[in-house]
Amino acid sequence: MDLHLEGKVIIVTGGFRGIGKGIVLQLAQEGAIPVVINRSDKAMDEFKHDIEQYTTTYDTYLLDLNDTDKIAPIVEETYKKYGHIDGIVNNAGKNDNKDLETTSWREFEESIHGNLTHYYELVHAAVPYLKESKGSVVNISSKTALTGQGKTSAYAAAKGAILGLTREWAAALVGDGVRVNAIVVSECWTPLYAEWIKTFGDEEAQKARLSVITDKIPLEHRMTTTEEIGNEAAFLLSDRSSHTTGQWVFVDGGYVHLDRALS
């Protein structure tokens, strides 16, 4: 299916690795122009190698998104260069395990800022241009917003707020033809996830832990792939989803909604 994303300018945060990279590569395959904001250049060489299998028309910016005031200038520069901005993917963030018992309110607030404020600022800065293009916003959220995890209060709060903002922005911008949706991720295999699994010990212990997790995923008892998240994001950014807004889309193999008895 042609998603008609050829030449569309899409800004993606956290796009060098993991879910963000999966989204960027899918956009590149569809002919879009990804503008990627990433905190570190650590994975840049591999990222460039992979994206250039599909396109050489893309931009990268190195920015710690905690430096909120530096987000709008990137948006302005992008618009000045291309004359249009057609979509935003808010993806960057980290589950930092700031739990209820040991996290001070200052640490809680800092975590919220790192996982939420840049979502707001990027869309805030891009709104005039999204109205011009009748563009689309995709916010990446997490199952922790709905299920909890037990030891990550700040991250869960930020991801819950992202779902609220998705509905709010969809309502605020519907009259301008701008669509806003969220993808809710559960258990997705990424480099960070792989690093976490390694903390459980030797290879046998890692496999055992992974089996406990995948057994709870009803569809095929496997992890979601970054490519599957990328496919959904590309669809939501495209005109093929032209009457879809304000939705929380669960790309999770039924993890959140299906009866645990199925596992």
Annotate each predicted stretch with a short phrase.
Residues V9, F16-G18:
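Conserved glycine-rich cofactor-binding loop
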Residues D99-L100, S104-I112, I213:
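Substrate-binding pocket helix/loop in short-chain dehydrogenase/reductase
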Residues V123, A158, T166:
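Active-site helix of classical SDR
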Residues P128, A171-G175, S242:
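Alpha-helical segment proximal to the catalytic Tyr-Lys
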Residues S142:
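Residue(s) in the substrate-gating loop at a strand-loop-helix junction
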Residues T147, A234, T245-S263:
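Short C-terminal tail/terminal secondary-structure segment
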Residues A182, E204-T244, V251-G253:
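C-terminal helical subdomain
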